Amino acid sequence: MSILELLPAIDIKNGKSVRLKQAQLDSAQQHESPSVVLSDFVAKGAKWVHLVYLDAAFKSGSNSDLVQNLIAASPIKVQLSGGIMNEDSLQKALSTKADRINIATAALQNIDWVVKAIKSNNERLTIGLDIDDGVLVARGSGEVIGDPFEYIKILDMAGCKRYVVTDNSTDGELNGPNLDLLEKVLKSTKSMIIASGGVSKLSDLKDLRRMGLDGVIVGKALYVGAIDISAAIKTCYQ
């Protein structure tokens, strides 16, 4: 069985590590400083971290220096996400030297630019697919973008290698991932899939690994102690 890449999440807002429910900023619950959280993940054996710059995603402030410094100091690989939806924000993200950049679902409103970005930076880009009730929605605003499978066809043709698929209704809820949705996405593309949202127990990770996904982003379950990160690493890699 292939490994399942584990990406523990750090969401940053106002310089603090926070967690959201269903991608809503007003649900933010504050935790420790991002650097402390990152150090803990590293000490326990994490190979990747999923770093979400919420201030950029929700246009609620700026902590770009903090994000830059975290990435520069990280001894493990970083996937950066948050507000990356045009050329300016993409270039700023690329300049951080993050190993992977996740383009926001909202960027798909300018699909021509996304296609161009994929062709220019394919090895470092993933495309976020935030899905609510079967349709793509822009995180935060909830603005409907369209049918995810129609967009996947376009993005596959452009050469997209990896998607981050989030069922917004499960994000931060600890009710388990939407396996049916993930299975449909897997069948629609040959690109790699990273699951996000809902993971609450080790058996969820086992299910996702059996499906053949490339990776999984885990946030709240780690922060509230529902999953021990050391056990999660063992489940995903051994």
What is each of the regions a protein language model found here?
Residues 48-66, 105, 165-174:
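Glycine-rich, proline-tolerant flexible connector loops at the mouths of alpha/beta enzymes
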Residues 30-41, 86-91, 143-154, 205:
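Short, acidic/polar
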Residues 61-68, 141-150, 175-183:
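Charged helix-capping and loop-helix junction motifs
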Residues 5-9, 48, 77-79, 100-102, ...:
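Structural preference for beta-strand elements that scaffold enzyme active sites
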Residues 92-113, 169, 197-201, 211-231:
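Glycine-rich phosphate-binding active-site loops on the catalytic face of alpha/beta enzymes
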Residues 13-26, 98-171:
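Conserved anion-binding
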Residues 17-61:
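N-terminal beta-alpha supersecondary unit
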Residues 74, 78-100, 180-215:
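Catalytic cores of alpha/beta
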